[in-house]
């Protein structure tokens, strides 16, 4: 278990069945490990029981000053350090060359497809962050991080929903003054909203509100 590791640990990557995740995080809290990426799926997107598991995890995180990416995600790819937390087979998904585009995506499938397309088209990637169900860390945290990242010059976001409306607008406004942000908002119609809810448990919301938020914060909206 984590408790048997003698050294200090900066980050855990958790990829075990969903019902066991809470126990691992409680062990992590005991060792005062402050950061976790939860790859495991089977939470909010599965209904009421999954929502309750997420709430318990969130309480552990708050009580122990812990930051969590995920669950139901691939995690991160840093193309400049070759650090990745995903379990992708790079024999099946091409690795893009180093570049200046960073990707934020709620959808793991879209992130994989975009990485593969970028490699085929010769488009350079700096970082990819897939945050899935967004139990804690979301767009409002990640945009300031990419704003200050020396390798990132352009930011692309694939968005099903947003974490905190006002915080997101302020973060995007600050970021877009330094680097262009291009966002693809899915779930604009009834079918898209249903797909987002079944995929990451996200409530896609009123598209008109997103459109207004993009205009206010300087985000360039993509259509496709």
Please provide the spans of the model-predicted regions.
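Catalytic-core regions of core metabolic enzymes
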Residues: 1-224
